[in-house]
Every structure is written in structure tokens, then in C-alpha cells.
């Protein structure tokens, strides 16, 4: 691992757990190395958490004041965007609730609440799941009545902008593409159900129960790891979720579910990464089985950054739909060995769905 990458992980662990820095061997760093570390933290969308980690560095190891001021301004922008997101989420949930629609908040601000300082986690969009087709259609009808332009995506999700924030509506809670496991996924949803969390203004919103929450994130990370790539932010989310939800998850049950989904090798790899690189104590894993080597996942993370946006050739908006599908297919092909080593069945069906244009 390169010096800058190692230093990033050291500072990330300190910021993620708000604890002292355990390894100072990477420091001091040159101005050029600090600049690269800053850019890498932005690529991985962990700028605010790494800045928090810098607070634990001895003064003589700190970067130049000019970069610190720039980093501070970027962190302040992240906090302000989170506050905007929280207000938009509150208003949208309130409107849906008053209209008889009960969304389930996926990831996002629900996961942010598990951080020591939620405002430092970089937010993306608002993801809602609707547990019936009727509820999904009612929500879609409501946004159209308000003049919002909802766009139907290839995977049948709906996207639109609400008060400056991108919102997505989903018909599936778990990113599971194996058709032979869809019934089991629904059974899990019915068995474990949902919890409630209070938003800042006091409005309640449904969130996945701890078991579903951990499964949702694991599958989400896997899907993106198989394609363009995944970033450190999503792995930090998983680490914080394991830590905060540990007492609400029964390890033998979780292991049984993972085995039935055929994800045991993947889960062991994920566990190894969380422990080795993000500092999650082994005792807080959903169950204590760990791969001997986490480097295959680490390689994917360094290669692509946040959802693979920094992979050479990755374009958010391709010149054509066909070109976009081709690019995504090529991205998956690069990870084909990874897929069939760690999640062969799910990897096969993710690729099949991708070819049919069912993935974003």
C-alpha cells in the first residue's frame, strides 16, 4: 500500500471512531503528499471524516495552513449540505405521511445517525423503498401532481429533484438479483420488518430493522464492487452500522441468512476489510468469520473511488444508452474473477440483469 493511502486509512480510522491515532509511521508528509491525501479523501467521499481524524495529529505533523483552511471549508460545505438534506427529508416524509404514504428510508441519513458526528458524513441522495406496488404508485402519483418530473430508470426506480436534493423511489429493499431468492428476500422483510427513527424536527420515518439494514448494505456494496467499484464511505457506513447495531443482531441467525443467500465468502471478505482497514473490533462483527486476505476488496476501492467515478473511461452520462451498457458490462468483466470467487451465484445474476438493462 502506498504511503498516502496508508495515511488516509490511519486518519480515517481516527475520525470514524473519534479516537487517538494508533500509527504515526506515515508522518511527517510533504506538501505534495498532503495534497494527494486531500484529493484522495474527496474521491472516496470521506473528506469530513478524515478532517476529523486530522484533529488527533500532533501539531508538528499537520499539513500546511493553506490546505487546512481549504479542508475546513470543504468540511463546512459538507455539514451545510447535510443540514439542507435533513430539512428536505423532514418535509418530504411529512408530506408523504400526511398523504397516507409510508416510505422506508434506505441508507443515507438513517445511516448517518449512527455516526458520532452525523454531519461529517457526506450525503448523497434520499432513497425511499415502498413495500407495496400500490404505495409506490401512489407516491409516484403524488410527485407528478406537484409538478415534479419523475424519471423512470432502467431498474424501474423513479428519480426526481426535491428542494435541491435528488430523491429515488425503489420497489426492492434488498439489492438481490438471484430470481430464486426473491421469495426468501420477501420472507426476510416480513420476518424482521422495520424500526422507526425520529428526524430532527420530530417527524417519524420507517427504517429497515438492524438485520435488514446490514443485509441491505452488504448487498449494495457487493453490487457496486462487482461493477464500476465502491468507495470508502459505504464501507465506513457498514462499520458504523455493525458497531451500533451489534446488540440487536443475533449472530447465528445472521450467519444462517448469509449462507442461504450464498454470500458467505463475500461476507468474510467484507468482515476482514472492516476489521483490518477501518478498525472495527472483531467483537462487533455480525458473526466472527473473517477472510485471511482483504486485499481484493481494497484493490477495487483504490481503483474506482466513490461508486467507481474515478475509473478511467467511466462517464456519468454516456453518449448513448448502448454505450453506457457496454461500458458497464466491461467494468463488470474486469471484476469477473472477483465475482465468481466471492459471490458466484449473485455475480452471475447481477451480470444477467445488467445485460438486460435492469441496473442503473
Language model features: what each stretch is:
Residues 1-124, 130-360:
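Conserved NTP-donor binding/palm subdomain of two-metal-ion nucleotidyltransferases/polymerases, i.e.
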Amino acid at each position: 500500500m502506498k504511503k498516502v493511502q496508508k495515511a488516509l486509512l490511519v486518519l480515517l480510522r481516527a475520525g470514524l471512531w473519534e479516537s487517538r491515532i494508533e500509527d504515526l509511521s506515515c508522518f511527517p508528509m510533504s506538501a505534495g503528499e498532503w495534497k494527494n491525501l486531500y484529493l484522495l479523501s474527496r474521491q472516496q467521499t470521506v473528506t469530513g471524516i478524515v478532517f476529523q481524524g486530522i484533529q488527533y495529529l500532533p501539531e508538528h505533523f499537520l499539513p500546511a495552513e493553506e490546505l487546512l483552511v481549504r479542508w475546513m471549508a470543504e468540511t463546512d460545505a459538507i455539514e451545510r449540505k447535510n443540514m439542507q438534506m435533513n430539512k428536505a427529508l423532514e418535509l418530504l416524509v411529512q408530506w408523504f405521511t400526511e398523504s397516507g404514504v409510508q416510505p422506508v428510508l434506505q441508507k443515507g441519513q438513517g445511516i448517518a445517525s449512527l455516526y458520532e458526528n452525523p454531519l461529517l458524513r457526506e450525503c448523497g441522495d434520499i432513497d425511499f423503498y415502498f413495500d407495496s406496488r400500490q404505495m409506490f404508485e401512489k407516491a409516484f402519483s403524488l410527485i407528478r401532481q406537484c409538478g415534479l418530473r419523475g424519471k423512470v430508470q432502467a431498474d424501474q426506480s423513479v428519480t426526481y429533484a426535491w428542494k435541491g436534493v435528488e430523491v429515488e423511489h425503489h420497489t426492492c429493499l434488498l439489492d438481490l438479483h438471484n430470481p430464486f431468492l426473491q421469495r426468501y428476500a420477501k420472507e426476510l422483510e416480513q420476518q424482521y420488518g422495520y424500526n422507526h427513527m425520529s428526524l430532527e424536527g420530530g417527524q417519524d420515518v420507517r427504517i429497515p430493522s438492524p438485520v435488514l439494514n446490514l443485509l441491505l448494505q452488504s448487498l449494495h456494496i457487493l453490487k457496486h464492487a462487482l461493477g464500476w467499484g465502491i468507495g470508502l464511505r459505504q464501507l465506513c457506513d457498514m462499520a458504523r452500522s455493525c458497531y451500533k447495531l451489534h446488540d440487536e443482531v443475533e449472530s447465528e441467525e445472521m450467519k444462517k441468512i448469509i449462507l442461504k443467500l450464498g454470500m458467505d465468502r463475500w461476507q468474510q471478505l467484507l468482515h476482514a476489510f472492516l476489521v483490518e482497514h477501518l478498525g472495527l473490533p472483531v467483537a462487533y462483527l455480525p458473526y466472527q468469520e473473517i477472510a485471511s486476505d482483504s486485499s481484493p476488496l481494497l484493490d477495487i476501492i483504490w481503483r474506482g473511488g466513490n461508486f467507481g467515478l474515478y475509473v478511467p473511461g467511466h462517464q456519468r452520462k454516456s453518449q448513448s444508452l448502448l454505450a453506457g451498457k457496454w461500458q458497464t458490462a466491461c467494468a463488470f468483466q474486469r471484476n469477473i474473477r472477483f465475482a465468481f470467487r466471492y459471490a458466484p451465484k449473485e455475480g452471475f445474476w447481477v451480470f444477467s440483469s445488467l445485460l438486460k438493462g435492469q441496473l442503473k
